Amino acid sequence: HGDREHGFIGARLRMNRKVIAGYWQDEDVQKRLGGWMRAAVGAAFSRTLKVMRFGDNMRNVAVTEGDKVEVQAKLGWQVNTWPVGTLVEYIDAVAETETDALMKELSEKYEINTDKVDSIRYQAKTEIAMKRLLDQEGCRAFSNTFEDLYGMEQLPGLASQRLMEQGYGYGGEGDWKVSAMTAVIKAMGEGLDGGTSFMEDYTYDLTKGNE
């Protein structure tokens, strides 16, 4: 009787709810239930999601703008800005031993096709610094833009990709909405085949048959 009573309570209080009817061991019922549970994970994840903006969004671009107050009221996302200079301080504070350890990991995981190892090393330091700052502030998503790199030597390209691999959401050119959605979908899809990642639209391969 518990499920029916619980359903009645939701109906009586006019609460938004999902009703799934069927035998609990049937594959179609389990699939619908699993889909609902993943949506619930996304909703719960959203309520405590913090997004770190390194600087502002790209200038003269409207699509990356948004109402940060409204999105916190409706979805729970806390979207705030940290100075790029703060990130630079964290980068400068990364120990050489930490960088050496991450460079060893990168060399084992990737085929580094460049003699500009110092550039890769800087990306390693940036990854360590960004992760440290994100974790310190409890943020699971971040954004940045090439127009706001005060004191940084490079745009954190490899560092951003690596952080996405570790479950953080990311959006380019200050697009905090995309970074937050990427983090939410990553949480919803945990344990499934495939993955979720941010990709610039001009990198798509739309060749017929090879999309």
Question: Which residues make up each language-model segment?
Answer:
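An N-terminal assembly and electron-transfer interface module characteristic of large anaerobic redox
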Residues: H1-E211
